[in-house]
Regions:
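Residues at secondary-structure transition points
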Residues: 107-111, 115, 138, 181-184, ...
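Single-pass alpha-helical transmembrane signal-anchor segments
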Residues: 2-24
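Amphipathic, coiled-coil-like alpha-helical scaffolding segments used for oligomerization/assembly
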Residues: 92-93, 112-177
Length: 196
């Protein structure tokens, strides 16, 4: 009776010690940082990759991906000459390690939909409105650089870093494309008439 009770008590105590010991360690994956929550409160300290000690059942570690992430966004805007422009923007960005805790606390894990996508929409509209539809085609690199700079200014304050910015496509309405084609045909006919 008594001996069996001591053995069972010893097994329960040993199991408890093992459970506490196993919950005292956490591992942060490569390319990630660990945000420490103590009773749900975000700590300013951010854990680097590797094995770390934590207070079992009191601290929780949230892994934030600090690798380069890709976002592709479709935007609709108007050019300076009021042409509707549909564009596709692709960018690579990452969360800076030191900003992981602040982003998790202020924005949460959905920073792409909360910060990145709206900022892209706003930057594309602001820059596109400065140029005519024709300039959007002929000055594409300059426009891309302006959009990238504006976007980087917007997202860097949150601890996000813009790596690569690309305008995948500028597309115009069928009516505008037909008008451009008609203009080119007229120019070619005029040039041909001059030569004849």
């Amino acid at each position: 009776g008594r001996k069996t009770g001591k053995i069972i008590g010893g097994i329960i105590a040993a199991a408890g010690v093992i459970i506490v010991a196993l919950n005292s360690f956490t591992s942060v994956e490569a390319g990630h940082s660990g945000v420490v929550l103590t009773f749900g409160k975000v700590s300013e300290a951010v854990l680097s990759e590797g094995l770390h000690v934590k207070v079992p059942f009191i601290q929780q570690i949230i892994q934030i991906d600090n690798r380069v992430l890709k976002s592709e966004v479709d935007c609709s805007s108007a050019s300076k000459d009021l042409q509707t422009v549909s564009s596709t923007i692709a960018l690579n960005y990452r969360v800076r390690n030191e900003a992981s805790a602040r982003i998790y606390k202020e924005v949460g894990p959905s920073y792409e939909s909360v910060i990145i996508n709206p900022a892209i929409q706003e930057c594309v509209k602001a820059v596109t409105a400065k140029y005519t539809a024709e300039q959007l085609i002929t000055e594409r690199q300059q426009i891309s650089d302006q959009m990238k700079e504006l976007l980087n200014d917007k997202i860097s304050s949150y601890g996000l870093e813009l790596e690569i910015f690309n305008i995948i496509a500028f597309e115009f309405t069928d009516e505008y494309n037909a008008a451009i084609e008609a203009k080119q045909t007229a120019q070619q006919n005029a040039l041909k008439a001059e030569q004849d």
